[in-house]
């Protein structure tokens, strides 16, 4: 499969182009949401460089410390990166990890919000639907790279994987679950749910939409990891799956805290009337 083109001797990959389209789509939807909520949409574009830098750093670090099994078999391990530090900067060697991108981007947005006296919770709610949209689009980069595919499958929508991109133990198997497509659809459902809640449930406390994003996205990724062949094992545990379980748990706790526990703690206590 063709995965890019060459300009002046430099290879341009479709993966990078699609990622940028996802970023722009996410920013576009965030500006729409900001305007609808009465916030300044220009802040989105001021925030974007921060989120991009934080997201790329986080995504790269996630890959470095949780390389997939196929790369470990090739000797591309965490220790390899630590002993070849220049390779850490070579994002074409290895790749990026979405969990790290979300964490790094969120941390960068938090720093931006504190620095510019913005509400971090409000802005996470604003960008959450766009984040889901950007992830849905970005997953199509995996299609051109022929990666993030699932277990062997004969279903009508299964995809053909070139021999060069198959895991050694599946070298004779041609068709697989399109895991990237499943996650794309799941992210679009997440975006739809967040847009619906943002319009139909105005009583939700600030930060609640991002909590819903965490729960919905984390749940989908957790179960999709069961289909994934090229996992990232740490001490025999699929670290991506463990992380997503933690994300779901934190999302539930955050949602309950914001909408149930904190309002009760802030509710003024009624004092009994004094007898006369």
Q: Locations of the language-model features?
A:
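Hydrophobic, membrane-interfacing alpha helices
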Residues: 1-276
């Amino acid at each position: 499969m063709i995965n890019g083109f060459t300009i002046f001797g430099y290879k341009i990959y479709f993966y990078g182009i699609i990622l940028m389209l996802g970023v722009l789509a996410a920013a576009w939807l965030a500006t729409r949401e900001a305007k609808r909520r009465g916030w300044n949409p220009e802040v989105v574009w001021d925030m974007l460089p921060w989120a991009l830098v934080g997201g790329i750093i986080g995504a790269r670090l996630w890959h470095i410390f949780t390389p997939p099994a196929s790369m470990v078999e090739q000797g591309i391990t965490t220790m390899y990166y630590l002993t070849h530090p220049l390779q850490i900067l070579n994002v074409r060697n290895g790749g990026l990890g979405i969990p790290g991108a979300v964490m790094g981007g969120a941390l960068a947005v938090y720093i931006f919000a504190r620095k510019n006296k913005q509400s971090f919770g409000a802005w996470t709610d604003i960008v959450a639907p766009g984040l889901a949209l950007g992830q849905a689009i970005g997953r199509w980069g995996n299609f051109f790279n022929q990666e993030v595919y699932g277990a062997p499958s004969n279903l009508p929508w299964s995809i053909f994987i070139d021999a060069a991109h198959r895991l050694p133990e599946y070298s004779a198997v041609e068709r697989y679950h399109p895991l990237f497509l499943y996650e794309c659809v799941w992210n679009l459902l997440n975006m739809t749910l967040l847009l619906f809640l943002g319009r139909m449930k105005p009583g939700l406390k600030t930060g609640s939409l991002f909590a819903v994003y965490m729960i919905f996205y984390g749940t989908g990724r957790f179960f999709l990891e069961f289909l994934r062949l090229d996992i990232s094992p740490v001490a025999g545990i699929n670290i991506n799956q463990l992380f997503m379980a933690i994300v779901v748990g934190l999302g539930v706790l955050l949602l309950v805290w914001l909408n149930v526990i904190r309002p009760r703690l802030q509710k003024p206590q009624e004092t009994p009337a004094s007898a006369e």
